[in-house]
Amino acid sequence: GFSHIAENLYLTDPCKVLLVTDPLPAPLLSHFLESRHVTVEKSDFHTLLFLIEPGDTKEKQDHLLSLLQECEAAYEANTPMSVFAPHLTCRKGEGLKDFSLRYQDFLCREGAARLTQALFDEDHFPKAMLTGKQAHQAFLKGARERVPLPKAKGRVSLEMILPYPPGITVLEPGEVWTDEVLSYFLFLQKYKSAFPDFSPEILGVHGNGNDAYVWVLKEA
């Protein structure tokens, strides 16, 4: 269906729209849009993904654009969070711009971009000590140990570790918890504490904050 695309060129999916929200936090914008009946497929720190369907109309497009313009105006006016997003947790008297700057400062201070990038660096990929089947069998046979998240470095995970967003497996069963992987998930615990309404779903990391733990292979 796309015969006009030149060879070796990447094809942008015409049914997906990726919106960069910086300086507004993408999860905040997602909450706002969903409260106005606009469905966001997913969000990370500063991007939103929308899916376009064949039946979508120009009216729906214009509606989304008007809501984004409303957000922009609210940001410039530093509209109180109690007005813009009354259902979200914020500091007393905090405006939308104040909240957004605090969010950005947190990500910069914690090195969110660096921590995320390290997960996709081939030099830092975890080593597999067991196959997925072996890890699953070890778990079922009781050769497992529950350890606090901060003490997971160097241990063999018996569960898949997956944060959503982005919905990409970071650690497969049988792979070793590396410093890069652990640092990222410790950061996510801080993120969940600082912005509880934006907590990502994390498969394989149980509990929250100081109570977070993971299942690893029991040491001999």
Where are these regions (language model features)?
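Non-catalytic terminal extensions of PLP-dependent enzymes
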Residues: 2-220
